[in-house]
């Protein structure tokens, strides 16, 4: 397993070609299990020290080799709650094993919360992801260019437009020319409480362009691979919108 480094150069295309398992823990937290069994967790959550509770319970007992926080807000920064004595990545840096590469690219939080936020690139099983955390839509073009084209983007959207408008969320996601958009950071029964003031995503889904295919997954876990991802439309004449994949619930950790 590699040591963590602070490099943030251009991100190369994903390693391997066998696919990678991704589990949606809830809110903005996802777990990748690479072909070499390396486990990478992004944005474990916790309730705030004061104010209304956001979550229906404590963060579940997830074991990981690397725990990543995109930024230092309570609902993204509970890396100390992760089991397995993971390596921690809480700012720009890199992590790599034979089966997975993770690169955190420095950017900025959306809205009134002007603070650092990392765009976290995960490459495994021949698939390239970017987890946007709570990133702004009016991003630094150089930061986004360093990430490059991805297969899957995780973006924060909900019907309350808590972080940014639906159009702004779409603009952020499309900057990476993804094949699939995965929504996150919304009201999810059993995980996120209504007292968070977040809402669901049904109105957001209804607002999407007419050619967007919405795929609702059966549960919180799926395998992403070249065989299951939609084909990339390479020419302007045949270009189509990406698909939107919505993870199901409720989570069971194995």
Task: Place the predicted regions along the sequence by residue.
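Zn-dependent metallo-beta-lactamase
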Residues: 1-36, 227-230, 246-254
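Metallo-beta-lactamase
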Residues: 3-17, 77-126, 209-232, 237-240
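Active-site-proximal beta-strand elements of phosphoester/diester hydrolases
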Residues: 21-24, 39-43, 100-108, 119-121, ...
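Soluble or luminal CAZymes and related metallo-dependent hydrolases
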Residues: 24, 164, 196
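Active-site neighborhood of phospho(di)ester-bond hydrolases with catalytic His/Asp-centered motifs
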Residues: 41-45, 63-79, 105, 130-133, ...
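Binuclear metal-ion centers of metallo-dependent hydrolases, dominated by the metallo-beta-lactamase
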Residues: 114, 176, 180-254
């Amino acid at each position: 397993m590699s040591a963590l480094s602070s490099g943030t150069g251009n991100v190369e295309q994903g390693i391997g070609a066998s696919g990678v398992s991704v589990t949606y823990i809830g809110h903005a937290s996802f777990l990748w299990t690479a072909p070499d069994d390396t486990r990478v967790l992004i944005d474990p959550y916790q309730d705030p020290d004061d104010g209304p509770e956001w979550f229906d319970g404590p963060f579940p007992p997830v074991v990981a080799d690397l725990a990543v926080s995109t930024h230092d807000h309570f609902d993204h920064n509970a890396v100390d709650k992760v089991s397995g004595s993971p390596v921690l990545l809480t700012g720009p840096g890199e992590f790599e094993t034979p089966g997975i590469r993770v690169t955190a690219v420095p950017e900025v939080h959306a809205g009134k919360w002007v603070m650092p936020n990392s765009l976290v690139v995960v490459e495994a099983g021949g698939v390239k992801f970017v987890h946007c955390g709570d990133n702004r839509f009016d991003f630094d073009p150089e930061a986004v260019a360093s990430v490059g084209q991805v297969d899957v983007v995780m973006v924060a959207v909900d019907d309350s437009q808590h972080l940014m408008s639906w159009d702004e969320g779409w603009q952020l996601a499309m900057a990476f020319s993804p094949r699939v958009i995965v929504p996150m950071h919304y009201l999810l029964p059993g995980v996120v409480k209504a007292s968070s003031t977040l809402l669901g995503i049904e109105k957001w889904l209804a607002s999407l362009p007419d050619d967007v295919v919405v795929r609702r997954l059966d549960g919180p876990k799926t395998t992403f691979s070249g065989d299951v991802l939609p084909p990339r439309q390479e020419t302007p004449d045949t270009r189509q919108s990406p698909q939107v994949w919505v993870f199901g619930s409720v989570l069971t950790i194995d």
